[in-house]
Curated annotation (Swiss-Prot):
The chain crosses the membrane at residues 1-23, 31-53, 100-121, 130-151, 180-203. Belongs to the protease PrsW family. It is found in: Cell membrane. It is an enzyme of class 3 (hydrolase). Its main location: membrane. Keywords: Cell membrane, Hydrolase, Membrane, Protease, Transmembrane, Transmembrane helix. It comes from Shouchella clausii (strain KSM-K16). The lineage of its organism: Bacteria, Bacillati, Bacillota, Bacilli, Bacillales. GO terms for cellular component: plasma membrane. Involved in the degradation of specific anti-sigma factors. Responsible for Site-1 cleavage of the RsiW anti-sigma factor. This results, after two other proteolytic steps catalyzed by the RasP and ClpXP proteases, in the release of SigW and the transcription activation of the genes under the control of the sigma-W factor. This is Protease PrsW. The gene is prsW.
Length: 215
């Protein structure tokens, strides 16, 4: 059991450390980061219940609808809502870059529990290869989401646009990831590898941009 917990936590902690050590935030308190991480973790069960019910009823028979609505919209929409309520509205963003730290926290909290459940179901050896790409992808969704929520807090003239981008872009990225995974069959790696490269280039770009903003 200890090995399962450590294996589930390791990818998330590595990615979180990467973002944390880049110093894109300033004075974000770690207990707030931990709270948002836990909130992300608690989202897993209700989301999985909804996804299971919708899948059983075949609500979204087309792979694209399932990828973008049942996975992208549901997961990223709820994560965005948690960030909006617990970070944005409660005044926890002390500078624009702090949004990235909170965005990564909620995403990796979700990914950690998701990984743990997968490992319990399929075993450690079968699960480890599966956890690397999804955890990385979740981190990127969180970076993009947090970047735009942070911008919305400090750029009042374009607040609505940034909040909207903070929701829509992660939904599209997540939906694209799941659509590739479910629809490309034997050719999935040919599509997934360049897609992941694009994701990480996008994440690095947002991290660099966020590090230049101060208030």
């Amino acid at each position: 059991m200890v090995s399962l917990v450590l294996a589930a936590l390791a990818p998330a902690m590595a990615l979180f450390s990467y973002v944390y050590l880049r110093d894109v935030y300033s004075k974000a308190k770690m207990f707030l980061v931990l709270r948002i991480f836990i909130i992300g973790a608690l989202l897993v069960v209700p989301i999985l219940v909804i996804q299971f019910a919708f899948t059983e009823e075949n609500v979204f028979p087309h792979p694209a609808a399932k990828a973008f609505l049942l996975y992208g919209f549901l997961e990223e929409g709820l994560k965005w809502l948690m960030l909006f309520v617990f970070a944005y509205q409660h005044g926890q963003l002390q500078r624009p870059g702090d949004g990235i730290l909170f965005g990564v926290s909620v995403s990796l909290g979700f990914a950690t529990v998701e990984n743990g459940l997968y490992m319990i179901a399929y075993g450690l050896e079968a699960a480890i290869p599966r956890t690397v790409l999804p955890t990385t992808a979740h981190a990127v969704y969180g970076i993009v989401m947090g970047y735009y929520i942070g911008q919305a807090k400090y750029k009042e003239d374009h607040k609505k646009m940034f909040l909207l981008l903070g929701a829509i872009l992660p939904i599209l990225l997540h939906g694209g990831y799941d659509f590739i995974l479910s629809s490309f069959g034997h050719y999935v790696l040919y599509a997934m590898i360049p897609f992941m490269v694009i994701l990480w280039l996008l994440a690095i770009w947002k991290l660099k941009k966020a590090s230049r903003f101060t208030v």
